[in-house]
């Protein structure tokens, strides 16, 4: 297995122009494909998850032109649901932002489809979405284990009506259903069961859907009413925001070691909830400055925090490694859905934090971290999880090197992450 040893980083300073958001990129690509007209996306993320979506759309008959650097994409929309001439098997890697929304969208048109992916994808639940789709008339079956991919889908259209979706495991189930619902033949009423996790990700979905011209009534995130027989309309130009989750590593690096780091592509006007990560850093003692399309972090004296991170679970992972540099015991609460991400992130994070010397308590939906007097050199296993690799790179901001196993797993969302980190540390 390939590994990368990061030597201690003595200073952090500079500016990072963020790659496009994974969440925004894949949502916008799918809606551009379904829309009438042509959409030109700029600052598209070039990564594995986006590549899986693009490959699937091409197989489904969508025409697009991708720039040489793969960050601009002109999509010619179908103006309707997908209706390929032959049965298709679509391999979606470990891309939840492709698997869940495509599973819903493929129910709308005609054709037979198998959706599959990497072994870890077959361990990531999809049952709550499938149950809701079936209630709206979909023909979906599990090919291996109940409630998990791979799926076999027969396009029959969705007839709307009232459906329930459990919101407590993943917001992607609701996102997927919301994006399909406007093309249903009757009005759809979606009722949320349980507490809705990662609510800011639903805001991303609603914002992009509005940009593509459809109407939804949001009743306090408990009920969503979606009129039937709508058409997505291409907005023309669509700028993909920088990835706020990716910003977290650089902002945290400044907080730990600063210097001053400015990240551009997100700011106080961002539609991504993960920009609130900067507020968590501020609560720890970091100096934060906001602009419309940038955030600046400057070093502060970091103190432990005890906080509910249900709304920003991805960025919360960065707090777990920043906690190694804070005074006191940090508690990250209400993050059960870490367990159903690219890996079981609660178990993985606890295991790897202990390797560098931290005292860790892992609960069903929380983790507490007490830093050691000095960090230990360790080989960090990344579990084929991009965020594990990026989070633990921050250990090098101490006086101790850190070895990252399988650093290439960052290709899921940020292929040149380690190059960018090096630029800031020169």
From Swiss-Prot:
GO terms for cellular component: cytoplasm. The active site is at residue 314. Keywords: Amino-acid biosynthesis, Aromatic amino acid biosynthesis, Cytoplasm, Transferase. The keyword Cytoplasm applies. PROSITE patterns: EPSP_SYNTHASE_1, EPSP_SYNTHASE_2. It catalyses: 3-phosphoshikimate + phosphoenolpyruvate = 5-O-(1-carboxyvinyl)-3-phosphoshikimate + phosphate. It is found in: Cytoplasm. It comes from the Bacteria. Pfam families: EPSP_synthase. GO terms for molecular function: 3-phosphoshikimate 1-carboxyvinyltransferase activity. Its EC number is 2.5.1.19. One of its GO terms (biological process) is chorismate biosynthetic process. 3-phosphoshikimate binds at residues 22-23, 27, 170-172, 198, 314, 337, 341. Its main location: cytoplasm. Pathway: Metabolic intermediate biosynthesis; chorismate biosynthesis; chorismate from D-erythrose 4-phosphate and phosphoenolpyruvate: step 6/7. The keyword Amino-acid biosynthesis applies. Phosphoenolpyruvate binds at residues 22, 96, 124, 172, 345, 387, 412. Belongs to the EPSP synthase family. Monomer. Catalyzes the transfer of the enolpyruvyl moiety of phosphoenolpyruvate (PEP) to the 5-hydroxyl of shikimate-3-phosphate (S3P) to produce enolpyruvyl shikimate-3-phosphate and inorganic phosphate. This is 3-phosphoshikimate 1-carboxyvinyltransferase.
């Amino acid at each position: 297995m390939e590994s990368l040893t990061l030597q201690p980083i003595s200073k952090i300073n500079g500016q990072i122009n963020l790659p496009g958001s994974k969440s925004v990129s894949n949502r916008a690509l799918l809606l551009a494909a379904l829309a009438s007209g042509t959409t030109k996306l700029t600052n598209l993320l070039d990564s594995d998850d986006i590549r899986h979506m693009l490959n699937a759309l091409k197989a489904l008959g969508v025409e697009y032109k991708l720039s040489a650097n793969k960050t601009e994409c002109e999509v010619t929309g179908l103006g309707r649901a997908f209706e390929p001439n032959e049965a298709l098997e679509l391999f979606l890697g470990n891309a939840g932002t492709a698997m869940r929304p495509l599973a819903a969208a493929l129910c709308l048109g005609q054709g037979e489809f198998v959706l599959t992916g990497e072994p870890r994808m077959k361990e990531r639940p999809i049952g709550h979405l499938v149950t809701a789709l079936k209630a709206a008339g979909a023909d979906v079956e599990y090919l291996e284990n109940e409630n998990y991919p791979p799926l076999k889908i027969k396009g029959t259209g969705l007839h709307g009506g009232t459906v329930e979706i459990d919101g407590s495991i993943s917001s992607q189930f609701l996102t997927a259903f919301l994006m399909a619902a406007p093309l249903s033949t009757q009005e759809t009423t979606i009722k949320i069961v349980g507490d809705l996790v990662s609510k800011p990700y639903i805001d991303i979905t609603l914002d992009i859907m509005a940009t593509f011209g459809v109407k939804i009534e949001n009743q306090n995130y408990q009920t969503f009413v979606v009129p039937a027989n709508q058409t997505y309309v291409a907005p023309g130009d669509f700028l993909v925001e920088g990835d706020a989750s990716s910003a977290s590593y650089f902002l945290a690096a400044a907080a730990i070691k600063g210097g001053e780091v400015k990240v551009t592509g997100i700011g106080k006007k961002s539609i991504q909830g993960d920009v609130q990560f900067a507020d968590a850093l501020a609560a720890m003692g970091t100096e934060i400055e906001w602009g419309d399309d940038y955030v600046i972090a400057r070093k502060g004296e970091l103190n432990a925090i005890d906080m509910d991170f249900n709304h920003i679970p991805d960025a919360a992972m960065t707090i777990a490694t920043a906690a190694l540099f804070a005074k006191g015991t940090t508690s990250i609460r209400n993050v059960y859905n870490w367990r159903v991400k690219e890996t079981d992130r609660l178990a993985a994070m606890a295991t790897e934090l202990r390797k560098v010397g931290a005292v860790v308590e892992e609960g069903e939906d929380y983790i507490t971290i007490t830093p050691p007097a000095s960090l230990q050199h360790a080989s960090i296993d990344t579990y084929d999880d991009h965020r594990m690799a990026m989070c633990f790179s921050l250990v090098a901001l101490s006086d101790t090197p850190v070895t990252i196993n399988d650093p290439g797993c960052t290709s899921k969302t940020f292929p040149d992450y380690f190059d960018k980190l090096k630029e800031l540390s020169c």
